[in-house]
UniProtKB/Swiss-Prot annotation:
Its EC number is 2.1.1.182. Belongs to the class I-like SAM-binding methyltransferase superfamily. rRNA adenine N(6)-methyltransferase family. RsmA subfamily. It catalyses: adenosine(1518)/adenosine(1519) in 16S rRNA + 4 S-adenosyl-L-methionine = N(6)-dimethyladenosine(1518)/N(6)-dimethyladenosine(1519) in 16S rRNA + 4 S-adenosyl-L-homocysteine + 4 H(+). This is Ribosomal RNA small subunit methyltransferase A. GO terms for cellular component: cytosol. It comes from Bifidobacterium longum (strain NCC 2705). SMART domains: rADc. It holds the Pfam family RrnaAD. Keywords: Cytoplasm, Methyltransferase, RNA-binding, rRNA processing, S-adenosyl-L-methionine, Transferase.
Length: 308
């Protein structure tokens, strides 16, 4: 995207973080799930795992006081940081100007809730064939943020995020495991996820009560035959995703029930036969490909709402 050379500057340590917070009158809040990274080695590791280069356009959600922001900018990348907290959004450009002044022109800060971000109100990525998300996500909204951005931005090609360890395990879980659930299978609609490392509690201020982990995700290419939605047009010209996600929600909303019982208002009996799926199985055993096959079968039977 650009031929910018990597920037030189100073990444934030614990003393820097506390000084910036004090100068700006900022205290970490539970409301926004704020735990600021105080270890330069950790943010460099995140950027390294994400594979960010000067050619990339990066979105960061929840930049906080700028620890990860500076590490991303250090690569020479261009980035847009989405911050919900007004004082933090206002402070971030000044922090970059202080610690990495030559990188200020490559940073755009958007004061907005990430769950409200769309290509229309944040058009920064409209000209990109693909962009990446690199973030230390607020633990309480990590999964909704990821699924929302993947739904709204077709060109969000990959992400590397730090989340609560239990959330990371669920995002990367495979069918049949006890932690496989709605986040796992919905994320699998878009691409492949894997856990790529753990992060200790002592690299944060304040230290959280839980461990953290890194999740790497790669989106399916449009022509990838492995993509569940590779052939996803429906009779009404929309996509199958809405029906597939409806099946997922119903199946995991009553995960101990058989598919026949959990999906009785959505899937007619013949749909299971058409899809080649045993209706006595539970939703926690189905792959995203099987949920997609069942959705296609329901469409071929007509209106799933009339299932008996």
């Amino acid at each position: 995207m650009n031929d910018t050379i990597p920037a030189t500057g100073h990444l934030l340590g614990a003393a820097d973080i506390r000084r910036i917070a004090a100068d700006a009158g900022i205290s970490p809040t539970k409301k926004f799930g704020q735990n600021f990274v105080i270890d330069p080695g950790t943010v460099r590791r995140i950027v390294r795992e994400a594979g960010v280069t000067a050619a990339d356009h990066v979105m960061e959600v929840g930049p906080g006081l700028g620890s990860l922001t500076l590490a991303i900018l250090e690569t020479g990348a261009t980035m847009t940081a989405v911050e919900i907290d007004p004082p933090l959004a206002e402070r971030l450009p000044g922090t970059v100007a202080e610690f990495m002044p030559e990188a200020t022109s490559r940073l755009t800060v958007v004061n907005r809730d990430a769950l409200t971000v769309t290509p229309e109100n944040v058009p920064d990525f409209s000209d990109d064939a693909s962009f990446t998300l690199v973030a230390n996500l607020p633990y309480n909204v990590a999964t909704p943020i990821l699924l929302t951005l993947l739904e709204r931005f077709d060109n969000l090609g990959s992400f590397l995020v730090m989340v609560q360890k239990e959330v990371a395990d669920r995002l990367a879980a495979k069918p049949g495991s006890k932690i496989y659930g709605t986040p796992s299978v919905k994320l699998a609609w878009y691409g492949t996820a894997e856990r790529v490392g753990t992060i200790g509690r002592n690299v944060f201020w304040p230290a959280p009560n839980v461990d953290s982990a890194l999740v790497r995700f790669t989106r399916y290419q449009a022509d990838d035959p492995a993509a569940p939605g590779a052939s996803n047009s429906t009779a009404d010209g929309g996509t199958q995703r809405e029906l597939v996600f409806r099946l997922i929600d119903a199946a995991f909303g009553q995960r101990r029930k058989t598919l026949h019982a959990a999906l009785k208002t959505i899937a007619p009996s013949e749909a299971f036969s058409i899809a080649g799926i045993d209706p006595t199985r539970r939703g926690e055993t189905l792959t995203i490909a099987e949920f997609t096959a069942l959705a296609k079968a329901i469409e071929s039977c007509g209106d799933g709402d009339e299932a008996q």
